[in-house]
Amino acid sequence: MDKFYNYNSSSNQALLNLKVKPDSKQNLISDFVIINNLPYLKLFIKTAPEQGKANEEIINYLAKAWKLSRSNIEIIKGHTHSLKTILIKNIDEDYLNSIINSYIK
């Protein structure tokens, strides 16, 4: 699989799938896994999935790890599920590629 995300160059936005494991020992971005022929970035989050706290931690952690504003990361699908889709706004595709390539093993 050669594309791990969907990028819209006219709006500088990307969609990225996440496989989230809440209630983990540490916050950690792992690698990609294929689920139903789609790539998902594995993400371990310390926070338990209670009252949206894990979703908030996902946004905080990714924003810090990727040096993005929290307002540029939005969960658009899977709010109550471990499989999520995030929208990343105002991101250059070259920068996104550098982020993604660091997790491909």
Swiss-Prot record:
PANTHER family: UPF0235 PROTEIN C15ORF40. One of its GO terms (cellular component) is cytoplasm. InterPro entries: DUF167, YggU-like_sf. HAMAP family: UPF0235. It comes from the Bacteria. NCBIfam families: DUF167 family protein (TIGR00251), PRK01530.1 (NF002419). Pfam families: DUF167. This is UPF0235 protein A1E_05380. Belongs to the UPF0235 family.
